[in-house]
């Protein structure tokens, strides 16, 4: 089914900030923007779920004419992306036919290359995981060996499925646009390696490369699941325990920081509803901000980085200290960027969720008390668990189909 996307003109849809199901963003009735309008409709079908949505509702939500919506949905049905989901009673007229997305009409692979482990997931158009593989990985074994092993795992995962492509997430720094790695902390041999081209050549599929933290943040931003400990799973904004009028969420323009603590420490930033990568994909190198000038030497060459202080504390088993250090860095981000929410993820956090949420939250609460500016910024555990980064990597391919994901 993937081959139909290019013919329909939605393969490369990048979207613009704030477009999406709940944003109230109008479509544009111009032939040149047919892909944009199709993405708006497709995203509404996605968020409507199995219950579906009528053509009239699609027109009302997008601002497109009923005729334009009918043409778009006819193409979507012809391409196998949408199908009828029954009929719904209406006021003062005949029942309306409702349409829904066909999740199995397309798939994407999300590949998380951690320093010592590989996770690969196959996701349908809704982002749901339909297959998964894990394997040990040595990121220091050399680029060619890693590419060969990763390609083998992806091929085994696909088992005959033809996906849109492969999203790859791994520690930075790197160039997202070119798919080229820089000096990954602890693995200088990766500097300058064109991972995107190497893996695409090996698999014969489109490949997108991003930092693990950016991928995880994207997965949260476009998803509808709620983080652990939140009040509701009904949607992105409400799922974080924030009031429905807060405007928080990818489409609503909210901002959050995703802090990933595992074999390293980094951040993914969503500012004004979009992933903030920076001009050179340099945003989010959170672990290497110095907070202790005479601190221990970090593998990056600096002293007193948050990463080395936090990982040293974890290694000693002093989780309260590790959480306090992480909280100090989170407080810096809150003060610098005025974000709405701090999300915590990564295997170290997953093993000690309560300790890290409590410890980071305590630092932010103390900051709020000192400044007298109201309630502290909330701290939550990010959704997705151990495969959150891999699921976010799949969204590097899926999100643009729905007019989302590009900052």
Regions picked out by a protein language model, each given a short descriptive name:
Residues 1-85, 92-95, 100-134, 138-156, ...:
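ATP-binding/phosphotransfer module of carbohydrate and carboxylate kinases, centering on a glycine-rich
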Residues 87-108, 207-233, 237-256:
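Conserved phosphate-binding catalytic cores of ATP/NTP-utilizing and phosphoryl-transfer enzymes
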Residues 108-112, 163-167, 256-260, 266-268, ...:
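Short glycine-aspartate micro-motif
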Residues 110, 118-122, 218, 266-270, ...:
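Short beta-strand scaffold segments in enzyme catalytic cores
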Residues 129, 136-225, 249-255, 356-366:
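Glycine-rich phosphate-binding loop and adjoining helix at the ATP-binding site
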Residues 170, 261, 346-347:
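Short secondary-structure boundary segments
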Residues 282-291:
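Short, intrinsically disordered, charge-biased short linear motifs at domain edges
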């Amino acid at each position: 089914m993937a081959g139909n996307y290019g013919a329909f003109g939605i393969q490369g849809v990048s979207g613009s900030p704030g477009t999406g199901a709940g944003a109230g963003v109008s479509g544009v009735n111009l032939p040149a923007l047919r892909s944009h309008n199709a993405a708006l409709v497709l995203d509404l079908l996605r968020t409507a779920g199995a219950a579906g949505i009528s053509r009239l509702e699609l027109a009302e939500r997008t601002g497109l004419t009923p005729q334009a919506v009918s043409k778009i949905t006819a193409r979507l049905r012809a391409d196998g992306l949408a199908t009828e989901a029954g009929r719904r009673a209406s006021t003062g007229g005949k029942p309306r036919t409702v349409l829904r997305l066909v999740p199995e009409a397309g798939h994407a692979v999300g590949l998380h290359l951690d320093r010592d482990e590989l996770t690969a997931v196959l996701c349908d158009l809704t982002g749901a995981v339909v297959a998964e593989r894990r394997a040990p990985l040595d990121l220091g074994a050399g680029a060619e060996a890693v590419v060969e092993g990763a390609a083998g795992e992806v091929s085994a995962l696909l088992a005959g499925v033809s996906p849109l492509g492969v999203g790859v997430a791994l520690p930075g720094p790197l160039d997202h646009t070119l798919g080229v790695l820089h000096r990954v902390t602890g693995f200088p041999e990766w500097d300058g390696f064109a991972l995107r081209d190497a893996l695409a050549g090996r698999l014969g599929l489109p490949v997108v490369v991003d930092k693990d933290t950016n991928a995880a943040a994207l997965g949260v931003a476009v998803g509808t699941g709620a983080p652990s400990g939140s009040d509701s799973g009904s949607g992105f904004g409400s799922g974080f325990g924030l009031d429905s009028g807060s405007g928080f969420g990818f489409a609503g323009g909210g901002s959050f920081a995703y802090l990933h603590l595992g074999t390293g420490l980094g951040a993914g930033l969503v500012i004004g509803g979009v992933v903030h990568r920076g001009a050179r994909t340099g945003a989010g190198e959170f672990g290497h901000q110095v907070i202790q000038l005479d601190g221990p030497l970090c593998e990056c060459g600096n002293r007193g980085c948050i990463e080395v202080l936090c990982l040293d504390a974890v290694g000693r088993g002093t989780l309260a200290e590790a959480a306090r250090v992480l909280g100090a860095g989170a407080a810096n981000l809150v003060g610098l960027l005025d974000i709405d929410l701090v999300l915590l993820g990564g295997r170290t956090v997953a093993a000690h969720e309560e300790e890290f949420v409590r410890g980071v939250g305590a630092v932010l609460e103390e900051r709020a008390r000192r400044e007298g500016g109201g309630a502290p910024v909330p701290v939550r555990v990010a959704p997705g668990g151990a495969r959150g980064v891999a699921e976010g990597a799949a969204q590097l391919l899926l999100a643009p189909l729905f007019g989302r994901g590009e900052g």
